[in-house]
Amino acid sequence: MVAPQFVLRDTEGTVHGPDEWSRAQAIVIFFTTIDCPLSNSYVPEMNRIRQTYSDRGVAFYAVQTDTTIAEAEVRRHARDFAFSFPVLIDPRQSLVQLAGATATPEVAVLSKSGKVLYLGRIDNRIEDFDKRRSVVTESDLRNALDAVLAGRPVPHARTPVVGCGINFLTQEKKP
C-alpha cells in the first residue's frame, strides 16, 4: 500500500501530499467542523497531543468535514481556536472516505501508506452529548499512538464516538 495519492491545501495555502505523508511514522487526522461544540472543545487537547508526539515523527492534521462551509470561515475558525497543526480543506471528503469517519470529533491514525490503524474517539471524556467525565480514564488516541510507535498492534483499533454527524457530500457549497 502506498501513501494516499491526493494533495490537499490547508487554510494558510500550504499544499500537503504523499511526499510529506510518507515521511511520517504515523498520521493523525482530527475530523472537525466549525459548528460542533464537542469538536471545538477538543482543540486544546489535540494541541497537547500534537506537542507530545510530533517530535516522535507523528504528523497531525485537522480536516474540516463540512464542505458547505466557506473556506474563509474555516480559516477564521482555525485561527480563533488556535489549532497548532494544519487544518486541511478537503472538498471531496477524501480523508473522510479513506478513514471511514462518521462524526466529529473523531480521529484516525494512519500508517505512512494510508492504512487506518485506529479510528474513534480521542478519549472517554465525553459520555453523551451533554455529559462529560470530570476525569478522563481512557486516552484512546494516546494509547493508539504509543502502540504504533512501538511497532505493536493498536489494542482497540475502533472505539465509539459521541459527536456531531458528518454531513456527506450532498449539498451545494456556500459562497
Name what the model sees in each region.
Residues 17-41, 60, 145:
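Short active-site neighborhood of thiol/selenol oxidoreductases, capturing the structured segment around
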Residues 33-44, 67-68, 107, 164-167:
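Short, thiol/selenol-centered motifs that function as redox-active sites or metal-ligating centers
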Residues 40-81, 88-98:
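Structural microenvironment flanking redox-active thiols in thiol-disulfide oxidoreductases
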